[in-house]
Swiss-Prot record:
UniProt GO molecular function: argininosuccinate lyase activity
Location, primary (coarse class): cytoplasm
Record-given protein name: Argininosuccinate lyase
InterPro entries, sorted: Arg_succ_lyase_C, Argininosuccinate_lyase, Fumarase/histidase_N, Fumarate_lyase_CS, Fumarate_lyase_fam, Fumarate_lyase_N, L-Aspartase-like
Enzymatic reactions: 2-(N(omega)-L-arginino)succinate = fumarate + L-arginine
UniProt pathway: Amino-acid biosynthesis; L-arginine biosynthesis; L-arginine from L-ornithine and carbamoyl phosphate: step 3/3
EC numbers for this chain: 4.3.2.1
UniProt-annotated location(s): Cytoplasm
A GO BP entry: arginine biosynthetic process via ornithine
One Pfam match: ASL_C2
Cellular component, GO, one term: cytosol
Transmembrane residue ranges: none
Keyword flag Lipoprotein: no
Length: 460
């Protein structure tokens, strides 16, 4: 039997089955069922308080909605394509439960402000979980950084050995990236904390509703100030997706380095078996698949952002059916970033750090060349001249297989007689790292200060 459309009074014919399926959104917007019921309960409570609905009718609707909430939690609700979307499906189920009085729930409300409210609630509910998941990863970074303050490794520019650094310093760089992610998502909460309900289709309503009461019931900071903006605004979704894309880009950069460092050529890290897989043909393989998946999933999250930007860019005010396309990318982004954060945290927490291999990589790579140039500058040689001198020494060393610390003192004293035995002390990788104690530098004291500051942030 055909379903009677709640909007069908103006129509003489129904669309083809395939058109109905094309227009339906229940396959994905059912993920907002809890938010839709939450919004409806607040709306009908407001209608009761303002006496727009008789108390008896409102109480009957409230009882029915609460029963649907229980059934939803128990997984007992069944949705149909014939009822198009989550709003119509739940209203149909409410009608089955309490009869025609269910139709009064939609008084002073449109699906336009209803879906916008659902979407706000969906993002509002998930933002704290996203922020906490980022902080959980930050805690792992801080813990591992604290254990590796004096672990020496090559620092890179252009993927070439540049200067020796502390592995703890490296990890704290990602902590700072993630802290900016936290701050962006926290700012996202401000724009999400506005309530569209009461804007109706686009122009408000003639009923004497109390939007401030509804906002309070739903724990929103305030209602939207403009009804057109309320039903058409998806900036908060764009912000979430932009933040998610930046977050995933940070995770992807980290995973790229994890992948490289687990290779035989680097050998700095070894992931635990829990976060690795093997090969169906090559028995020796231990592949960093989880890191590769996070790197790969970054593309899809970036795509969701670009997709919604493209959808919205040409929409006239106020609501358009195009906005049905605002949800799937959002839902998928949430389902992508949460396990990605957990996987990266787990990989780092359980990875073996090959400290010896890291340190050895700094011994014959000439990454102490800047130390020698700085040393010469302290002897009164202009830095540019010192730079050129060290460059020549590096070139000579590359040809002869001699490191800077293997050059005889007599050779150094040909450059400047003031050069003493202490030059060899300064050329040690650990000393080079330890001495870089400028604010924010890789010096051990600075890294410890970064870690303490991070712990303070995480304790708030």
């Amino acid at each position: 039997m055909a379903v009677k459309r709640m909007w069908g009074g103006r129509f003489e014919a129904t669309g083809a089955k395939w058109v109905e399926e094309f227009g339906a959104s229940i396959s994905f917007d059912q993920q907002m069922a809890a938010e839709d019921l939450e919004g409806s309960l607040a709306h009908v409570t407001m209608l009761k308080e303002t006496k727009i609905l008789p108390a008896a009718d409102a109480d009957q609707i409230i009882t029915g909605l609460k029963k649907l909430q229980d059934q939803l939690e128990a997984g007992e609700l069944t949705f149909t394509v014939e009822n198009e979307d989550i709003h119509m499906n739940l209203e149909a189920l409410l009608t089955e439960e309490i009869g025609p009085v269910a139709g009064k729930l939609h008084t002073a409300r449109s699906r336009n402000d209803q879906v916008a409210t659902d979407l706000h609630l969906y993002v509002k509910h998930r933002l704290p979980h996203v922020i906490q998941a980022i902080k959980d990863l930050q805690k792992v970074l801080v813990e591992k950084a604290a254990a590796n303050v004096e672990t020496i490794m090559p620092g890179y520019t252009h993927l070439q050995h540049a200067q020796p650094i502390s592995y703890g310093h490296y990890l704290m760089a990602y902590f700072q990236m993630l802290q900016r992610d936290v701050e962006r998502f926290e700012f996202n909460q401000q724009h999400t904390d506005l309530m569209p309900l009461g804007a109706a289709a686009l122009a408000g309503t003639t009923f004497p509703i109390d939007r401030e009461l509804t906002a309070k019931l739903l724990d929103f900071q305030a209602p939207y100030a403009n009804s057109l903006d309320a039903v058409s605004d998806r900036d908060f979704v764009l912000e979430f997706l932009a933040n998610a894309a930046i977050l995933m880009t940070h995770l992807s950069r980290l995973c790229e380095e994890i992948i490289m460092w687990c290779s035989y050529e680097f050998g700095y890290l070894e992931l635990s078996d829990q976060y690795s897989t093997g090969s169906s043909i090559m028995p020796q393989k231990k592949n960093p698949d989880m890191a590769e998946l996070v790197r790969g999933k970054t593309g899809r999250v970036n795509g969701h952002l670009l997709g919604l930007l493209t959808t919205i860019k040409g929409l006239p005010l106020a609501y358009n059916k195009d906005l049905q396309e605002d949800k799937e990318g959002l839902f998928d982004a949430v389902k992508t970033i949460m396990p990605s954060l957990k996987v990266v945290a787990g990989m780092l927490e359980t990875a073996h750090v090959n400290k010896e291999k890291m340190a050895q990589a700094t011994e014959r790579d000439f990454s102490n060349a800047t130390e020698l140039a700085d040393y010469l500058a302290t002897k009164g040689i202009p830095f540019r001249q010192a730079h050129a001198i060290v460059g020549q020494l590096v070139l000579e060393g590359l040809k002869t297989g001699t490191t800077l610390q293997e050059i005889p003192l007599a050779k150094y004293q040909e450059i400047d007689p003031a050069i003493g035995e202490d030059v060899y002390h300064d050329l040690q990788s650990k000393v080079a790292v330890e001495r870089r104690n400028s604010l924010g530098g890789t010096g051990f004291d600075q890294v410890k200060a970064q870690i303490e500051a991070a712990k303070q942030l995480l304790s708030k």
